[in-house]
């Protein structure tokens, strides 16, 4: 690679790092062990993976640890050229390399493995699509790295991003045991919480909402299309017809209340067999576009039908369904917040079994606790409620889990 191109790469890296805003950080930034030789950050498109990487570089920069940012979605950059850039970087004193959007580069697994093997004093991180399956990737990467997953923003992060904080995350056990005190403390600072919560459900899960403004819904739908048309084919062999089936399946499910899905009927409607239909659902779930809720027994079975299907988050649901059902929005919100920090299963009673112990039933302000009152560690997550009482917890408070 010629010197002019290398200079250009370093100029782009320096500009991207120093133009990065540090005023707001995603929660994951402080949880990653950046001292590891190889760190990966995977997550749905639009959640802020690139910004997280650049923020860390800016905060950690110094003459003793020269670093380089390299985006692999450049169409002119081959695997061999990316390796040459890394080799030049190390030979000239570089000790850190940060690769962005690795799934755009064919053979990225081999590149990362070779860099990890050939340059022992080089450490760094890479970002990639949530569709990547590290455990099945080439180069035996799973044992070489720490994998970190970045979900959409929580309600707490949205409040901080809006300048209404700072608020710290709350453990689930604290929310369940002391929700009245916690809710009062938050309300004393916010004044009102429900209008902010409604805004979050509409647009607050993706940081790009501030730039998108009134075009947020269009941009989110465009993001979904990019996941299906660009990211998915980059991460595995998938036929254009399968992508069309996935888009149709997503459209149907976005406007359907969560229920035990008739996958056979859905597949018949879309013209695919059951096995292919389940695989499409699993791909949409990996991408963060859907959430598949199953009982503990079904989770152990390959290609099993999930007990319930949800959109990935309330913003996606609102963007793809003209008038989303309010009850479905509630459940989608709760599941999206819980799955970032806990294991969630479909229970015989109630809506969600959390960490194998806590039973949650989700409902509106008129929801009665009597249905689950005899079950230990059972709680109601209630909408349109500022402060709860007893085992009735305001639904918005679960947005403080991360």
Predicted region positions:
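Structural recognition of the conserved hydrophobic beta-strand(s) that form the central parallel beta-sheet
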Residues: 98, 123-129, 149
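Short glycine-rich substrate-engagement loop in P-loop NTPases that contacts/grips substrate
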Residues: 64-93
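Conserved lysine of the Walker
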Residues: 49-50
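Accessory nucleic acid-recognition modules appended to NTPase machines
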Residues: 205-348
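Interdomain motor-coupling "hinge/lid" segment immediately C-terminal to the ATP-binding subdomain
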Residues: 2-16, 129, 135-243
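Conserved P-loop NTPase "ATPase switch" module shared by AAA+ and STAND
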Residues: 90-108
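Walker A (P-loop) phosphate-binding loop of P-loop NTPases
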Residues: 45-46
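A cross-kingdom feature that marks ATP-driven nucleic-acid transaction machinery
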Residues: 1-22, 32, 42, 55, ...
């Amino acid at each position: 690679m010629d010197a002019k191109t290398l200079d250009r790469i370093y100029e782009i890296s320096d500009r991207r790092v120093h133009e990065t805003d540090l005023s707001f950080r995603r929660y994951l930034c402080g949880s990653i062990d950046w001292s590891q030789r190889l760190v990966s950050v995977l997550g749905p498109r639009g959640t802020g993976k690139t910004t997280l990487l650049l923020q860390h570089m800016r905060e950690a920069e110094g003459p003793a640890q020269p670093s380089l940012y390299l985006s692999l979605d450049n169409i002119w950059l081959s695997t061999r050229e990316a390796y040459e850039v890394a080799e030049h970087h190390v030979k000239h004193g570089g000790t850190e390399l940060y690769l962005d959007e690795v799934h755009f580069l064919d053979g990225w697994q081999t590149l990362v493995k070779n860099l990890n093997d050939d340059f022992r004093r080089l450490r760094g991180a890479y970002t990639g699509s949530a569709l990547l399956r590290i455990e099945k990737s080439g180069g035996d990467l799973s044992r070489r790295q720490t994998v970190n997953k970045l979900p959409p923003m929580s309600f707490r992060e949205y409040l901080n991003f809006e300048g209404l904080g700072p608020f710290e995350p709350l453990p689930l056990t604290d929310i369940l045991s002391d929700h009245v005190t916690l809710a009062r403390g938050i309300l004393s600072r916010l004044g009102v919480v429900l209008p902010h919560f409604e805004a979050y459900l509409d647009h607050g899960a993706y940081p790009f909402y501030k730039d998108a403004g009134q075009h947020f819904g269009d941009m989110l739908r465009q993001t979904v299309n990019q996941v299906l048309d660009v990211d998915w084919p980059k991460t595995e062999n998938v036929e254009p017809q399968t992508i069309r089936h996935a888009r149709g399946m997503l459209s149907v499910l976005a406007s359907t209340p969560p229920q035990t899905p008739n996958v056979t009927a859905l597949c018949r409607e879309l013209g695919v067999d059951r096995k292919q239909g389940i695989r499409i659902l699993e791909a949409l779930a990996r991408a963060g576009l859907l959430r598949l809720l199953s009982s503990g027994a079904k989770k152990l079975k390959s290609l099993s039908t999930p007990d319930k299907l949800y959109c990935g988050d309330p913003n996606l649901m609102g963007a793809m369904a003209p008038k989303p059902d309010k009850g479905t929005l509630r459940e989608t919100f709760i599941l999206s917040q819980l799955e970032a920090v806990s294991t969630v299963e479909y229970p015989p009673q109630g809506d969600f079994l959390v960490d194998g112990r806590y039973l949650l039933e989700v409902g509106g302000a008129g929801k009665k606790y009597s249905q689950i009152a005899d079950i230990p560690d059972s709680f109601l997550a209630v909408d349109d409620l500022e402060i709860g009482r007893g085992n009735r917890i305001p639904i918005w408070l679960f947005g403080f889990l991360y």
